Amino acid sequence: VKVRVGNVEHDLRVEAAFSVPRLGFQDNFFCAFQSLLPDGIQPTKFTGPFWGQCMDRVLLDMMDRTDWILCTDFDSVYEADTVQRLLTAAMVSGYDAVAPMQCKRDEGIPMFTPEGHFEIGRVEIAPSWFEATIQPVDSAHFGCTLLRSSALKRTKTPWFVGTPAEDGHWGDAPEGQRQRVEEDIAFWKTWKNSGNTLGICPQIAIGHAELMFTWPGRDLKAVYQYPTEYWKAGGRRPAAAWGSAEHAEASAK
């Protein structure tokens, strides 16, 4: 991949790593194609039920023959120039890992932890923070993230090992108890503890594909519902949806 920074053109060896299930989203595949093919970036995937194990194997497979590895999830959506912009940010900043902004499914919160804010909860960030090309963070995601191969080589192993909550289980622990650590977050902790840097690019953002239920509303306008909200409500449609119990009660008055 040729990346121009100022008057200097860099020729980088870049490949893309995928950990995928057997079935996936076509929108993701085609946006990946439009980003990877023009730059000749070869994608490699490992398939299996355990995301961390597949990602470990695909990273190990390409680590020695690349300068950078693009890790991308099978539910990410991005534009054709996203990878080039990330590579430019990586070369300008000198960071070992560079990720774009991405929101978490269901909750809609940004998927990164500002540096020094692990396990603090809600964090307020000044608007000026988002004006920078890159900002240091303690965790990010793998939606469309660049890893410097030389930094990956010095990262301690194992790479992807999560830990359960204080009670030994994987559910949400009560407040005040140690929460579970997912395998992707465990990777970033190990990455940083191995002396590597991690940055988020506030000026670059990608989408996150997720299933939504669309109901006709009581005013015949669309009402949207997350699947988790549907099941938490006992398999019930939203109150604002046509045919809901609340709709029936209002119609009976």
Predicted regions located by residue number:
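Polar low-complexity intrinsically disordered regions
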Residues: K2-V5, A17-S19, D75, L87-A89, ...
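Residue-level detector of anion-binding/catalytic polar loops
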Residues: D75, D96, T197-G199
